[in-house]
């Protein structure tokens, strides 16, 4: 399955909620969802009532789109979360939040996760002093992520830092913008991830059918 490369604003409209996929633009009056808060297409303004399956499917699609993950990989995360001891929902969110592209975004070195994935792919980051160019690389507590010295003048990174400098970072991450680095302190607790607009239990139920 190919990665979606179309207009990401259509994804927000499809899910009926802001997914903040374009970063800075999502906070302005240019946001496509604010201007047209209905599904794309000829019949987009006529939303039908969803079945229980439809609700679960939409929840799953929403989480995938927020984190920019394809179906097979997301399914593997769910399987891994189910096999681990403890709350499956928390296990899943910890796997998603530990991805390198997500952590780069959370630290504020990218405007959105899509941009973070591209920057990681192009080798602009070090993890514990070593170059890692795999967006799905899973970080462990106390891992240090750093912008490579030769990448610190890249305009999109500088712009992201400027945009995020005054914004609060999440409690499981520590950031030092002046030195272009941050630390993944620990895995987050489920209740700490407050910007996920769906109930993960609904997602788990979709894969438990």
From Swiss-Prot:
Q: Enumerate the GO terms in the molecular function aspect.
A: rRNA binding; structural constituent of ribosome
**Keywords carried by this UniProt record:** Ribonucleoprotein, Ribosomal protein, RNA-binding, rRNA-binding
Which InterPro entries does this entry report, sorted A to Z? Ribosomal_uS4, Ribosomal_uS4_bac-type, Ribosomal_uS4_N, S4_RNA-bd, S4_RNA-bd_sf
Q: Is rRNA-binding there in the keyword field?
A: yes
Q: Which residues belong to any copy of the S4 RNA-binding domain?
A: 98-166
Q: Pfam families this protein is in?
A: Ribosomal_S4, S4
Task: List all membrane-crossing ranges.
Answer: none
Share what the entry says about its subunit structure, partners included.
Part of the 30S ribosomal subunit. Contacts protein S5. The interaction surface between S4 and S5 is involved in control of translational fidelity.
Q: Which HAMAP family match?
A: Ribosomal_uS4_B (MF_01306_B)
**Which protein are we looking at?**
Small ribosomal subunit protein uS4
Species of origin: Thermotoga neapolitana (strain ATCC 49049 / DSM 4359 / NBRC 107923 / NS-E)
């Amino acid at each position: 399955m190919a990665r979606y490369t179309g207009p990401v604003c259509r994804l927000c409209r499809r899910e009926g909620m802001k997914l903040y996929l374009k970063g800075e633009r999502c906070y302005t009056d240019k946001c496509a969802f604010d201007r047209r808060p209905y599904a794309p297409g000829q019949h987009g303004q006529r939303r039908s009532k969803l079945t229980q399956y439809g609700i679960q499917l939409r929840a799953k699609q929403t989480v995938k789109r927020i984190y920019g993950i394809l179906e097979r990989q997301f399914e593997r995360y769910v399987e891994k979360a189910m096999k681990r001891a403890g709350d499956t929902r928390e296990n899943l969110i910890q796997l998603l939040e530990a991805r390198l592209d997500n952590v780069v975004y959370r630290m504020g070195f990218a405007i959105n996760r899509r941009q973070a994935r591209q920057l990681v792919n192009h080798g602009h980051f070090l993890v514990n002093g070593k170059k890692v160019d795999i967006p799905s690389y899973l970080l462990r507590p106390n891992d240090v992520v750093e912008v490579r010295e030769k990448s610190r003048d890249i305009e999109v990174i500088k712009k992201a830092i400027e945009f995020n400098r005054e914004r609060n970072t999440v409690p499981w991450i520590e950031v030092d913008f002046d030195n272009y680095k941050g630390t993944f302190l620990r895995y987050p607790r489920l209740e700490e991830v407050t910007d996920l607009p769906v109930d993960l239990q609904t997602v788990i139920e979709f894969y438990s059918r």
